[in-house]
């Protein structure tokens, strides 16, 4: 009995590692950039692949464990990732806005550098969003199969998991709807 509790609680390590990896990516890039000044043999290109690697780990966990993860656990994993990455995307959006505003400085080269930085940060952010999607898509599909959410809402929710800001809004809506469904199920069970 204790082994199942440990196994079920261990699933939460994966989204926490994903969130930590996303937050540590800029720090590791900065540290490797500082180390590169002192030695030429340090490559920081692998750090940019971190969202892809962590996203593949998320996908592998969801595909391998599949039915062993409950709907509630999938929702908690989704909420951990989506809610914890709100400050990350907020700061990324601010950096993009600053990069785009730098286009209007009198330095001519910034006309080209500002949009390049903005596009690069947007791609990294979207890859992070893509890497966070396996848990949320698995939750939405499972909830639809169990009758918690309708098919139309589920289709829209899956589509919007790949758009900034709307993904978090849909996770909030789905979590509230799941809570209401769970309360209704408890009432029916008690009667």
What are these regions (language model features)?
Residues 91-136, 144:
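Membrane-proximal helix-loop-helix units in multi-pass membrane proteins
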């Amino acid at each position: 009995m204790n082994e199942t509790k440990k196994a079920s609680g261990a699933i939460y390590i994966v989204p926490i590692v994903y969130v930590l990896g996303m937050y540590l990516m800029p720090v590791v890039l900065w540290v490797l950039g500082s180390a590169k000044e002192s030695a030429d043999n340090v490559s920081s290109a692998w750090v940019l692949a971190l969202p892809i690697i962590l996203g593949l780990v998320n996908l592998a966990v969801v595909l391998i464990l599949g039915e062993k993860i409950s709907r509630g656990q999938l929702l908690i994993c989704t909420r951990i990732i989506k809610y914890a990455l709100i400050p990350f995307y907020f700061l990324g959006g601010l950096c993009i806005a600053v990069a785009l505003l730098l286009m209007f400085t009198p330095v001519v080269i910034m006309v080209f550098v500002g949009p390049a930085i903005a596009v690069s940060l947007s791609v990294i952010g979207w890859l992070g969003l893509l890497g966070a999607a396996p848990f949320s898509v698995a939750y939405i599909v499972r909830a639809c199969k169990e009758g918690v959410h309708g098919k139309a809402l589920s289709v829209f929710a899956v589509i919007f998991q790949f758009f900034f800001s709307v993904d978090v809004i849909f996770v909030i809506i789905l979590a509230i709807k799941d809570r209401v469904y769970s309360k209704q199920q408890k009432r029916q069970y008690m009667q």
